[in-house]
């Protein structure tokens, strides 16, 4: 097995280096900035080492086997119907926006990107995994590019909508990536970011046992507050924020709704399950039983 090469970083939100240890998980340390409250992995594996992890077949077809470097997905292709549902829910608040050019950052194998395309958007995707983007291109016929967002020569002021779904926590430098995206977006364009919220009620209760402390895959553990501050600093205005709890927190099923979602789609129960899921999310919001946040913001 490849030896893990660790690196120390400063806070991505405020640049401070003063932290306190929040959790120790296996060989990895999660810290909290004493200045702004951002939670992140420090030290962490070198980003190039993690890129090799994401580039592997085993990451997307791990069979549920966890390694020192990643949790992975038992079979990513079985999430297609669920990711279509996620895409539809994500677009509900912006359904009045006329479809234009869309960029999905962290598009993976392209299932959500495919759904965005079906909804009328001129869709582009980017992901650091060549394995995933090759699938998106060859199997789904999508415009999927391999690499980090700052490596592409998209024109400035080009995109009408940018989506970042459960990806920002993997980014080595979220600030730099968001600054790049800000340049690529038209004035008034919308960015949608969904990520786990470490300041939600469920993470506070479960602490180091919280299901979404995936280390070392997750470099950052944003809260709704730290993510909003980062977006505002870069030049976005917050227009909407929704918080909810994922079923993974309730079932103890750590990486993405494995048990209930599999049953729902295998037995074609979507017509029954989707209203129930929406009700579950509404109750979770009312009780503040949250561990995931979605922020809608526009470029100033």
Task: Give the ranges of each region predicted by the language model.
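Conserved N-terminal segment of class I S-adenosyl-L-methionine
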Residues: 1-165, 175-178, 243-244, 262-263, ...
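A SAM-dependent methyltransferase catalytic signature shared across enzymes that methylate proteins
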Residues: 12-19, 224-242
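Short catalytic micro-motifs in class I SAM-dependent methyltransferases
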Residues: 165-172, 217
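Short N-terminal helix/helix-N-cap motif within the alpha/beta-hydrolase-1
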Residues: 172-176, 203
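A short glycine-rich, Lys/Arg-flanked "PGG" loop and its adjoining helix->strand segment in the class I
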Residues: 175-190
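Short, glycine-/aromatic-enriched active-site segment of Class I SAM-dependent methyltransferases
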Residues: 193-220, 225-232, 254-258
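Conserved catalytic loop of SAM-dependent methyltransferase domains
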Residues: 239-271
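A transmembrane-helix-recognition feature enriched in membrane-embedded lipid enzymes
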Residues: 265-293
């Amino acid at each position: 097995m490849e030896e893990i090469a660790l690196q120390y970083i400063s806070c991505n939100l405020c640049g401070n280096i003063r932290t306190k240890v929040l959790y120790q998980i296996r060989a990895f340390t999660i810290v909290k900035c004493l200045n702004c409250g951002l939670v992140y992995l420090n030290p962490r594996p070198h980003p190039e080492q993690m890129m090799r992890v994401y580039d592997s077949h085993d990451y997307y077809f791990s069979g549920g086997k966890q390694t020192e470097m990643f949790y992975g997905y038992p079979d990513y292709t079985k999430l297609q119907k669920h990711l279509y549902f996620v895409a539809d829910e994500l677009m509900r608040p912006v359904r009045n926006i006329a479809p234009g050019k869309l960029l999905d950052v962290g598009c993976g194998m392209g299932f959500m990107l495919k759904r965005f395309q079906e909804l009328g958007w001129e869709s582009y995707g980017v992901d650091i995994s060549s394995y995933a983007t090759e699938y998106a291109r060859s199997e789904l016929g999508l415009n999927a590019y391999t690499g980090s967002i700052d490596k592409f020569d998209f024109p400035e002021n080009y995109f009408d909508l940018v989506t970042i779904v459960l990806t920002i926590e993997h980014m080595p430098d979220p600030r730099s990536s968001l600054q790049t995206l800000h340049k690529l977006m038209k004035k008034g364009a919308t960015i949608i970011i969904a990520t786990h919220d470490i300041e939600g009620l469920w993470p506070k209760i479960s602490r180091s046992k919280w299901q979404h402390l995936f280390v070392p895959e997750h470099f950052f553990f944003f809260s709704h507050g730290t993510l909003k501050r980062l977006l505002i600093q870069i030049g976005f205005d917050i227009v909407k924020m929704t918080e909810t709890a994922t079923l993974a927190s309730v079932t103890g099923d750590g990486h993405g709704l494995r048990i209930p979602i599999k049953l729902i789609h295998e037995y074609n129960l979507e017509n029954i399950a989707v209203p129930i899921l929406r009700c579950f999310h509404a109750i979770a919001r009312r009780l503040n039983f949250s561990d995931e946040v979605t922020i809608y913001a526009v470029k100033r």
